[in-house]
């Protein structure tokens, strides 16, 4: 199971929000590129970036910070936030982002997601952020009447690389990941699912790994890495598969 350390970008800095509230942002590193390099040095194989300002603005805002991160690391990077048209998708993939995550546009314009999957196979993820089971968009500011599973099923045959599923009520709250909801989503899909929101201890990683057969491919970890609740080496060892043990 992959661990995706998260770098959420707000005003050019690496921050963590509480339940998606931009007014409750804690700055963990004013230099996101240095943070990205540190995660790479710790042994992580992926990075998960979110342009928080972009998610609210509907367009890239922290492009300079993302570019500096890409200059510092060699591991693959996935990026979400403010990516809502084909031109922006093409721009980011051309600049070195391995995968883009489409959230709001997946609800508003599902055909764009399908077109992007055809144009860029294996490089398009769908981000489904749920509040009480319903999809939230526009930087989590608006909650729709669409259920998370119903949205995910729309893309079953589209060639989406992964579904990034976030439980908003758990995000940044350090109350534990919603394993049950994530596994329930994954078991109904053929698309791999990446869990997000609320990871606070190694026990969360073990609980998710125990549900790997449902289709949970990875987990995004944020605040717990920044405040030391999760030790990177222990986390990587716990989630390693047989192929990692042979390395």
Curated annotation (Swiss-Prot):
Its EC number is 5.3.1.16. InterPro entries: Aldolase_TIM, His_biosynth, HisA_bact_arch, Isoase_HisA-like, Isoase_HisA-like_bact, RibuloseP-bd_barrel. One of its GO terms (cellular component) is cytoplasm. It catalyses: 1-(5-phospho-beta-D-ribosyl)-5-[(5-phospho-beta-D-ribosylamino)methylideneamino]imidazole-4-carboxamide = 5-[(5-phospho-1-deoxy-D-ribulos-1-ylimino)methylamino]-1-(5-phospho-beta-D-ribosyl)imidazole-4-carboxamide. Pathway: Amino-acid biosynthesis; L-histidine biosynthesis; L-histidine from 5-phospho-alpha-D-ribose 1-diphosphate: step 4/9. One of its GO terms (molecular function) is 1-(5-phosphoribosyl)-5-[(5-phosphoribosylamino)methylideneamino]imidazole-4-carboxamide isomerase activity. It comes from the Bacteria. Belongs to the HisA/HisF family. This is 1-(5-phosphoribosyl)-5-[(5-phosphoribosylamino)methylideneamino] imidazole-4-carboxamide isomerase. It comes from Rhodospirillum centenum (strain ATCC 51521 / SW).
């Amino acid at each position: 199971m992959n661990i995706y350390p998260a770098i959420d970008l707000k005003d050019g800095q690496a921050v963590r929000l509480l339940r998606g509230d931009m007014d409750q942002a804690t700055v963990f590193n004013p230099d996101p590129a240095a943070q990205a390099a540190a995660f790479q040095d710790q042994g992580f194989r992926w990075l998960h970036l979110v342009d928080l300002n972009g998610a609210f603005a509907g367009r890239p805002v922290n492009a300079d910070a993302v570019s500096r991160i890409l200059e510092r690391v060699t591991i693959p990077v996935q990026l979400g936030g403010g990516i809502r048209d084909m031109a922006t998708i093409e721009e980011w993939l051309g600049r070195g982002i391995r995968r883009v995550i489409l959230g709001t546009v997946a609800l508003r314009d599902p055909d764009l997601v399908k077109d992007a999957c055809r144009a860029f196979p294996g490089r398009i993820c769908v981000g489904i952020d749920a509040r009480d089971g319903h999809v939230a968009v526009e930087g989590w500011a608006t909650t729709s009447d669409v259920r998370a599973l119903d949205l995910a099923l729309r893309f079953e045959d589209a060639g989406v690389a992964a579904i990034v599923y976030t439980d908003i009520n758990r995000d940044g709250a350090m109350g534990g990941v919603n394993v049950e909801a994530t596994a329930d989503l994954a078991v109904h899909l053929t698309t791999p699912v990446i869990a997000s929101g609320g990871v606070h201890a190694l026990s969360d990683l073990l609980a998710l790994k125990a549900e790997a057969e449902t289709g949970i491919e990875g987990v995004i970890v944020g605040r717990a890495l920044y405040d030391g609740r999760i030790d990177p080496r222990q986390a990587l060892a716990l989630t390693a598969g047989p192929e990692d043990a042979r390395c």
